């Protein structure tokens, strides 16, 4: 069953500007065949050199918000592809006033294009959709294709 679009979704996303890093990919440009390169400068985004932890599939943001609250010396970036869901996470982060937490909208398959090599200290995959059907296994965040992406952006010895 599809999730119903939240009321005033675009306005709510716009109001989350200070925690919203935007889309990983401009999907319309990608369909037109335009190449995109937007490497994230974490030092510029957060204004410090603290280690970066990445949560892939953050959902409504409960884990990311709590982790950022407990670890103010770590920069957190949470990624979610569902706009209906990530808006709740961003609103919660704004309410908690956490300067060390930002959000990206998009699919995990594009992470490698936007995170520099060896830039993330730890990656979290909490309760991501298991895609139980055999034909959907390539969509699982633990599929070998995704593991290679994570390996590329993780620092040596990263978790």
Predicted segments, located by residue:
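Class I SAM-dependent methyltransferase "Motif I" SAM/SAH-binding loop
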Residues: 57-61
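Short beta-strand element of Class I
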Residues: 74-77
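Conserved beta-strand/loop positions that form the S-adenosyl-L-methionine
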Residues: 56, 79
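Short alpha-helix immediately C-terminal to the canonical SAM-binding loop
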Residues: 86-88
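A short glycine-rich, Lys/Arg-flanked "PGG" loop and its adjoining helix->strand segment in the class I
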Residues: 142-156
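Conserved SAM/SAH-binding beta-strand->alpha-helix loop
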Residues: 82
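S-adenosyl-L-methionine
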Residues: 1-52, 62-69, 90-117
């Amino acid at each position: 069953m599809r999730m119903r679009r939240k009321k005033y979704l675009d306005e709510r996303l716009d109001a989350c500007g200070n925690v919203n890093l935007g889309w990983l990919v401009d999907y319309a440009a990608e369909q037109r065949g335009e190449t995109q390169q937007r490497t994230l400068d974490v030092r510029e985004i957060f204004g410090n050199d603290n280690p970066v932890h990445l949560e892939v599939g953050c959902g409504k943001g409960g884990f990311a918000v709590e982790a950022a609250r407990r670890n103010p010396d770590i920069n957190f970036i949470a990624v979610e592809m569902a706009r209906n869901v990530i808006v709740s996470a961003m609103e919660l982060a704004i309410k908690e006033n956490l300067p060390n937490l930002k959000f990206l909208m998009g699919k995990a398959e594009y992470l490698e294009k936007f995170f520099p090599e060896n830039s993330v200290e730890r990656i979290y995959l909490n309760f991501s959709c298991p895609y139980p059907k055999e034909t959907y296994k390539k969509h699982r965040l633990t599929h070998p294709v995704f593991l290679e992406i994570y390996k590329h952006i993780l620092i040596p010895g990263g978790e």
